[in-house]
Amino acid sequence: MIKVIPNKKNIGAEIVCDLRKFSKEDLKRLKSALYKYGVIFFKKQNLSSAMYLKFAKNFGKLANYPRLKGLSKKFPQIIVVQRKRTDKGPSFGEQFHTDSIYTKKPPRFTMLLSKIVPKKGTANTEFCSQYLAYKHLPTNIKDKLKTIKGIYSSEG
């Protein structure tokens, strides 16, 4: 059984459940919440790498990242993103971005599993809805956007 708690902002919902055991009906509700709210959050989950990937496969084919080293040969799709206090320079993915958008066939969904979470306000991962952003644009800008193309690149 899952419980869906919509975020008070315009995007996202917290899902209360145990991801180690859920039914087909629960999965339908998870997917429905994902489509409705754009991003879903699961707090206090204790998943092994194998359980994490098993859960991820419910949402489609797993992506490989040829430029990034996976956790291990057994789990190449799990990319460890970490920053130590002693690290210098820009953080991986610190600027606004859409995961994997630069690939030929980007995955429909992205998952992030936090093992160590910094104190609130010290390092924030934020989410936004491009659907809502577009919806609130003036008509003249929407019309202009229909005539142009964007090129995505991870080259910088």
How does the language model describe each region?
Residues 2-156:
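Non-heme Fe(II) oxygenase catalytic core, chiefly the N-lobe of the double-stranded beta-helix
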